[in-house]
Amino acid sequence: MKFSPSLLRGTLIKRYKRFFADVELEDGTIVTAHCPNTGAMSGCAEPGYTVFLSESTNPKRKLKYTWELAQTFDGHFIGINTHNANKLVAEALDNKVLKEFSDITRWKAEVTPPTANSRFDFALERENTQHQGIIEYMEVKSVTLAENSKGFFPDAVTQRGAKHCLELARLAESGIKTSLLFCVQHTAIESVQVAEYIDPTYAESVKKAADAGVSLLAASCIIDEQKILLNQTLPLIL
């Protein structure tokens, strides 16, 4: 996913009320940008970080700028916009980036299975040996919480996330293939694990999903101020 037009560079002054970030642009102008991340953003929003903003030309928007990237003091990039995770996965599916999904023939975003109560990020189709299309479902989570080289999810309690895991487990138990993909938008992260110390209920739901046969995996991203690309799988520690 390439950023076009180019992002604007600035310095983070502060993030507040979850959805707002004050940023000083390179020319000294101070602007308020939309923060498209409702999580705790621990370690992602330190005052003084270099940040990168996209600029909207839509006159109806209340905030002209959206916070897309942050760069830590030691140079690591973080994808702030959680909405980009699904875009990155869609692009990776099209380009056969991950071998686990290289035989996907078609996909559709935002789908509610006929027997489920939750909408999932993707319905995927593979062909079996009889060349019949088999549908499976995937949920995507964006990971940005880093401690040393380890990534953790979630960074805040997520009842919705736990519900999704249990729904994936129920589908898996009924014979439908399901997967949970952690999209790592932080270049310092080398492995991923569930943050049981933040949300033990979510951690338990992930374990139940794994026991039910849900496929769990994590994937890293290449990130710089021009682009974000899903790259390769990372170790996932349960």
UniProtKB/Swiss-Prot annotation:
Taxonomic superkingdom: Bacteria
Gene3D superfamilies registered for this protein in UniProt: 2.40.50.580, 3.40.1350.60
InterPro entries tied to this protein: SfsA (IPR005224), SfsA_C (IPR040452), SfsA_N (IPR041465)
A single GO molecular function term of this UniProt record: DNA binding
Family: Belongs to the SfsA family.
PANTHER family: SUGAR FERMENTATION STIMULATION PROTEIN A
The name this protein goes by in its record: Sugar fermentation stimulation protein homolog
